[in-house]
């Protein structure tokens, strides 16, 4: 299989390591990386900053049409502003799962994500419905998982890197609530694609996981 046509879908719940691994893997391979979760967070940021209610779907859809999202050099831009750091706020984190349930939001972002898939070679895309909905024809599908304690510790470390001090018990509670929403939502729920490879990241380092995925890529390309 020609390298330029290779696309990888990486899915998993919050804290499973999918964004970190996808970013590191893309850097190692020199490929493109799209973090779809960042798209949902960017839209959430816009709604919060502009005090837009997401309960009136008709008016919300009109507003969504005016929002421009784009990726460049692993940074996400909201109406031409780099919001890569802003979207990591606790306020965005608190509301993003509710915004992600809105049909109009999912429709807008699914269209954008599919356009990116169609026009981007050597692509690694991570999220919650990439292998099942966004990129079902991906050359390699991976579903990452980890136990709740490990996921909470990772989230706490990520928060600390962003200057936020958070309580591990509260993080675990939030992760469980997020899991319930993600697995049970009506539109594009979080689920493992039938042909996805399950990798438990609980006891694996980033380097070990990247080595495993690199081996899987090589096997797929030889097939």
Swiss-Prot record:
Gene Ontology CC terms, in alphabetical order: cytosol
Binding site residues for ATP: 12-20
Gene3D superfamilies assigned: P-loop containing nucleotide triphosphate hydrolases
Record's subcellular location: Cytoplasm
MF term (GO), any: CMP kinase activity
Highest taxon in the source lineage: Bacteria
Main subcellular location of this protein, as a coarse class: cytoplasm
Pfam families hit by this protein: Cytidylate_kin
A single BP term in Gene Ontology: pyrimidine nucleotide metabolic process
EC number: 2.7.4.25
Reaction equation(s) it catalyzes: CMP + ATP = CDP + ADP; dCMP + ATP = dCDP + ADP
The keyword Transferase is assigned to this record: yes
Cystine bridges: none
Keyword check for Cytoplasm: yes
UniProt KW keywords: ATP-binding, Cytoplasm, Kinase, Nucleotide-binding, Transferase
InterPro entries the UniProt entry points to: Cytidylate_kin, Cytidylate_kinase_dom, P-loop_NTPase
Name of the protein in question: Cytidylate kinase
């Amino acid at each position: 299989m020609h390298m330029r046509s290779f696309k990888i879908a990486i899915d998993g719940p919050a804290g499973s390591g999918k964004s970190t691994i996808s970013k590191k893997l893309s850097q190692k391979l020199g490929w493109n990386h799209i973090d779809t979760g960042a798209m949902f967070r960017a839209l959430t940021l816009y709604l919060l900053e502009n005090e837009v209610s997401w309960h009136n779907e008709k008016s919300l859809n009109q507003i969504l049409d005016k929002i421009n999202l784009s990726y460049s050099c692993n940074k996400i831009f909201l109406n031409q502003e780099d919001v890569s750091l802003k979207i990591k706020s606790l306020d965005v984190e608190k509301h993003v799962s509710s915004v992600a349930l809105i049909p109009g939001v999912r429709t807008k972002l699914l269209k954008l994500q599919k356009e990116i898939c169609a026009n981007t070679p050597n692509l690694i895309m991570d999220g919650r419905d990439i292998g099942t909905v966004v990129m079902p024809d991906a050359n390699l599908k991976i579903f990452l998982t980890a136990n709740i304690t490990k996921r909470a510790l990772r989230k706490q470390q990520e928060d600390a890197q962003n200057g936020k001090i958070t309580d591990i018990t509260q993080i675990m509670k939030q992760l469980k609530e997020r899991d319930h929403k993600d697995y049970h939502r009506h539109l594009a729920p979080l689920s493992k694609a039938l042909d996805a490879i399950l990798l438990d990241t609980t006891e694996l380092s980033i380097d070990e996981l990247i080595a495993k995925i690199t081996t899987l890529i090589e096997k797929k390309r030889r097939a």
